[in-house]
UniProtKB/Swiss-Prot annotation:
Enzyme class, UniProt record, top EC level: transferase
NCBIfam families: PRK04069.1, rsbW_low_gc
Name of this protein: Serine-protein kinase RsbW
Stored PANTHER family: ANTI-SIGMA-F FACTOR RSBW-RELATED (PTHR35526), SERINE-PROTEIN KINASE RSBW (PTHR35526:SF9)
HAMAP family (alphabetical): Anti_sigma_B
SUPFAM superfamilies to which the protein is assigned, alphabetical: ATPase domain of HSP90 chaperone/DNA topoisomerase II/histidine kinase
Matches recorded under InterPro entries: Anti-sigma-factor_SerPK, HATPase_C_sf, RsbW
Length: 160
């Protein structure tokens, strides 16, 4: 049996000024689903990075389109960001990027590639497909209230 989910799909011009619309939409969807504030902030950064990569690299001189699909599941939000522009080899790029090295001078930091590292760090799962264009599938799981062994929820609130 296929897992039930709701789908929201959007298409926007691949221009920097439209990335904020996607961030706001994602925040609204995540809030409705019950995500914690910190998780929503992480997802906003990740989706911004994915969209900005498309704006900067996918279409060169042409103005293309970004397709965004939100898959709303009971326990997670899946976000697909796709373009039909110029692709690149993610494995090659991934091998060249990594965490910030505190021993390296700032002027030696790479200008590109940190966005994918950020996405990978902030999301619970990431898959990248590059055939015709690039598709980034990011997943964030909802962190529900933790339950102790006796079945009582753990709370940070005092009861008076």
């Amino acid at each position: 049996m296929m897992e039930k989910f709701e789908k929201i799909e959007m298409k926007i011009p691949a221009k920097a000024e439209y990335v904020a619309i996607i961030r706001l939409t994602m925040a609204g969807v995540a809030n409705r689903m019950g995500f914690a504030y910190d998780d929503m902030e992480d997802m906003k950064i990740a989706i911004s990075e994915a969209c900005t990569n498309i704006v900067q690299h996918a279409y060169k001189e042409d103005v293309g389109e970004i397709t965004i699909v939100f898959g709303l599941y009971e326990d997670r939000l899946e976000i697909m960001v796709a373009d039909n522009g110029v692709s690149f080899n993610f494995s090659t790029l991934k091998s060249k990027v990594g965490p910030y090295d505190i021993n390296k001078p700032v002027e030696h930091l790479p200008e590109n590639g940190l966005g994918l590292y950020l996405i990978n760090t902030l999301m619970d799962d990431i898959q990248i497909m590059h055939d015709e264009g690039m598709t980034v599938l990011m997943t964030k799981y909802i962190q529900r209230e933790q339950v102790e062994n006796d079945g009582n929820p753990i709370s940070t609130y005092r009861s008076y």
